[in-house]
UniProtKB/Swiss-Prot annotation:
Belongs to the sigma-70 factor family. FliA subfamily. One of its GO terms (molecular function) is DNA binding. This is RNA polymerase sigma factor FliA. Keywords: Cytoplasm, DNA-binding, Sigma factor, Transcription, Transcription regulation, Virulence.
């Protein structure tokens, strides 16, 4: 770590930048796999590079946060800001996501339990296969689910701030006052959906690796992930 400081004991920002440039590509590749093919890797790299520059410029070691942790927050935050500014999620996808969440909420209230895929599909008036495709189409928009939550419930619920960006919407919720409510909601999910969230967000397995654990394909994992997040939003939205 000494190579990151000048002879005067001042942090060498250029050396810090050079050492952590590979982190930008790592985070960009991790994010790209969750996005439509239309999102270019170069755009993510450029935004992430700006995030790293901001991290280098604003990092204060005296605050006690490791630079890697701080840099990852800045890099990911910059990439997500870039995606939000482009509003890449089609309106039809957002509409479908809302309709699925609404159907789930209505059924859960009526049944007193988690609704099955067949029940949700019937409520929407579509075949199960079409419902599963809808889950696939809407899964990518889950990156911004916490933004939609904030819009629905107001700024009094601080899920995301510039200084405290986290890596995913689930972690955003777990860092706030909603932690216990989120944990209770997760525990009420179907077992396979709980497992998907645990493997994806805590163990950081990718879709292919989770598929191997569950003995299903990547598309099925994506569907389960999408369905789990929608259930969480529905459960939390009632409270």
């Amino acid at each position: 770590m000494n190579s990151l400081y000048t002879a005067e004991g001042v942090m060498d920002k250029h050396s810090l930048w050079q050492r952590y440039v590979p982190l930008v590509r790592h985070e960009a590749l991790r994010l790209q796999v969750r996005l439509p093919a239309s999102v270019e890797l170069d755009d993510l790299l450029q935004a992430g590079g700006i995030g790293l520059l901001n991290a280098v410029d604003r990092y204060d070691a005296l605050q006690g946060t490791a630079f890697t942790t701080y840099a990852v927050q800045r890099i990911r935050g910059a990439m997500l800001d870039e995606l939000r500014s482009r509003d890449w999620v089609p309106r039809s996808v957002r509409r479908n996501a809302r309709e699925v969440a609404q159907a789930m909420g209505q059924l859960e209230q009526e049944l007193g339990r988690n609704a099955t895929e067949t029940e949700v599909a019937e409520r929407l008036g579509i075949p199960v296969a079409e419902y599963r495709q809808m889950l696939l189409d809407t899964n990518n928009s889950q990156l911004f689910s916490y933004d939609e939550w904030r819009e629905e419930h107001g700024d009094s619920i601080e899920l995301v701030t510039e200084e405290h960006q986290q890596e995913n919407p689930l972690h955003q919720l777990l860092e706030g006052d909603l932690r216990q409510r989120v944990m209770d909601a997760i525990e009420s999910l179907p077992e396979r959906e709980q497992l998907v969230l645990t493997l994806y967000y805590q163990e950081e397995l990718n879709l292919k690796e989770i598929g191997a654990v569950l003995e299903v394909g990547e598309s099925r994992v994506s569907q389960l992930h999408s369905q789990a997040i929608k259930r969480l939003r529905t459960k939390l939205g009632k409270l």
